[in-house]
Regions:
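Sec-dependent signal peptide recognition
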Residues: 2-8
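Glycine-rich beta-strand-to-loop/alpha-helix junction loops that act as flexible
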Residues: 28, 79-81
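Catalytic nucleophile loop
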Residues: 76-78, 107, 113-139, 226
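Glycine/Thr-rich phosphate-binding loops of Rossmann-like dinucleotide-binding domains
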Residues: 34, 85-87
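A short, gly/pro- and small-residue-rich
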Residues: 88-106
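Short, solvent-exposed loop/turn and secondary-structure capping segments
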Residues: 88-89, 135-136, 144-145
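Amide-donor transfer/coupling interface in amidating biosynthetic enzymes
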Residues: 20-74, 101-118, 145-254
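N-terminal signal peptide c-region/cleavage motif recognized by signal peptidases
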Residues: 14-15
């Protein structure tokens, strides 16, 4: 089954290579219980509407398979999902540590490091922001509600993800500032966040309690919220994906 999935992924890449639009790789979640890979369709839809060709990247234990795909795509999206296991940043799991997928952690860390080494543009979303920071040498706050962030605000909204839930302040001059301006309203569905920054990364947006909501590095934009779930009602959020597609077009020319 995994071989079939990878064959389909490579077929999609081959078809996309004949087009002029850039190929945007999207990492997927993995369910061990039924041995399936999946991702919310909102990521696929956002890439299509931003002008790219989405290519799903299922988890593979063979790092050579990851390298083969990363030789083909023009950009990489790290999608949302489970908590990143603290073993990857030298800590033990706290009592508040949530659902995990160590296989996915390991695979995505490989993808991120490959992408960075090849200067492939990266957009990391929610968990994606967290695993990117870990992959590049940073650490995470394992649970915001039990941490020292103050004043406390809710980071796990009960309303639909299409609805903004809290504000963020964006650092002037950052890539996200050029896309959204100095303030934005975002959705939120996480209980972990970036703690110690990876070398070369910079926090470029924060929530009112100081929780990091975006970080950037060379060729990398990470957001803690889900713009792909908001853009139908809030079109400015699609600009984050359009920005990635434009960066992918430039990479494709090289």
């Amino acid at each position: 089954m995994k071989r079939t999935i990878w064959s389909i992924a490579l077929l999609m890449i081959s078809i996309g290579a004949m087009a002029q639009k850039p190929l945007i790789g999207i990492s997927t979640g993995y369910s061990a219980s039924d041995n399936t890979a999946s991702v919310r369709f909102t990521y696929v839809d956002a890439v299509v509407n931003a002008g790219g060709i989405p290519v799903l990247i299922p988890l593979a234990k063979d790092s050579l398979a990851a390298a083969e795909v990363m030789n083909k795509v023009d950009a990489l999206i790290l999608s949302g999902g489970e908590d990143v296991h603290p073993f990857f940043y030298g800590e033990e799991p706290s009592p508040h540590f949530g659902k995990e997928c160590v296989e996915r952690d390991y695979f995505e860390i490989i993808l991120i490091r490959l992408a960075k080494s090849k200067h492939i543009p990266i957009l990391s979303v929610c968990r994606g922001m967290q695993v990117t920071n870990v992959a590049l040498g940073g650490s995470l706050c394992q649970d915001i509600p039990s941490s020292d962030y103050s004043p406390k605000i809710q980071h796990g909204q009960y309303s639909t993800n299409t609805t903004p839930h809290h504000s963020i302040s964006i650092v002037p001059g950052s890539r996200l500032y050029l896309i959204l301006g100095g303030k934005a309203l975002v959705n939120t569905h996480h209980h972990q966040c970036v703690k110690d920054l990876a070398p070369g990364m910079h926090i470029t947006a924060t929530a009112p309690d100081g929780v990091p909501e975006a970080m950037e590095g060379e060729g990398i934009l990470c957001v803690q919220f889900h713009p792909e779930s908001m853009y139908e009602k809030h079109p400015e959020m699609l600009e984050i994906y359009k920005d990635l597609v434009e960066r992918a077009k430039e990479f494709k020319k090289k």
